[in-house]
Regions:
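Conserved G/P- and acidic residue-centered "switch" motifs that form tight phosphate/ATP-binding loops
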Residues: 79, 112, 163
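Conserved short alpha-helix immediately C-terminal to the canonical SAM/SAH-binding motif I
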Residues: 117, 163-166
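Conserved hydrophobic beta-strand within the GNAT/NAT acetyltransferase core sheet
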Residues: 155-159
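Short beta->alpha junction loops/turns
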Residues: 38, 160-162
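GNAT-family acyltransferases
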Residues: 1-107, 122-152, 176-196
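Conserved active-site tyrosine of GNAT-family acetyltransferases
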Residues: 170
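Conserved acetyl-CoA pyrophosphate-binding loop and the N-cap/start of the following alpha-helix
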Residues: 108, 112-121
Length: 196
């Protein structure tokens, strides 16, 4: 399944995308400055590369829903792979809501692509079929209603407070700031409650 926006195309990544995909992550600091996560350690990068290989070779990616982000050529066809994005933590093992993420090549920053991706991805994400379920989540994610037993579905985003670009992207997409992560005052948490 693929979808697109005005300047971008999004689709599941294929084995033929692997080399271009790893090139995005071999840049100086694509995760730290462009996405919604903190700088990964060497062991996290090694685990990521191994998981990525499994995804491309065996399609084994259960805890993520991700797509490649491609430029759209003037004729409307798929262009260069410039990053990936989606949601992770779908298994709720850390008692967190699924979190939105994106990573873009440094040379395409500050062109509105991250905002364009997040807005279009959210449109597709919220249109997917749902089932009622029970899960434990962090109280911080519930905002002022942390005492409630039930909550409407939402997406989260953990972002370094130094990452002003990602904060702007998330807020343009409608996410609201909830506070700082416990024990990590440099990391903020944003949430977006389902519009449905």
């Amino acid at each position: 399944m693929g979808f697109s926006s005005e300047r971008l195309m999004f689709r599941p990544l294929l084995a033929s995308d692997f080399t271009a995909y790893l090139a995005v992550y071999k840049q100086e600091a694509p995760l730290y400055d462009s996405g919604t996560s903190s700088r990964p350690s060497q062991s996290q990068l090694e685990t990521f590369v191994q998981g990525t290989r499994e995804y491309f070779i065996q399609r084994k990616l259960i805890h993520y829903a991700m797509v490649g982000i491609f430029l759209k050529k003037p004729d409307g066809t798929e262009g260069e792979l410039i990053g990936d994005g989606g949601v992770f933590l779908l298994d709720n093992r850390d008692e967190k809501w699924p979190e939105v993420y994106y990573v873009l090549k440094k040379e395409v920053w500050n062109k509105g692509y991250a905002t364009e991706f997040v807005k279009e991805f959210l449109r597709v994400w919220w249109s997917l079929p749902r089932e009622n379920t029970r899960m434990r989540v962090q109280a911080l994610s519930l905002g002022p209603f942390f005492y409630r037993q039930e909550a409407q579905e939402q997406l989260g985003a953990e972002i370094s407070m130094n990452n002003k670009g990602s904060i702007r992207v998330i807020e343009k997409a409608g996410f609201e700031f909830c506070g700082f992560l416990e024990g990590k005052p440099e990391m903020g948490y944003w949430r977006l409650v389902s519009p449905n």
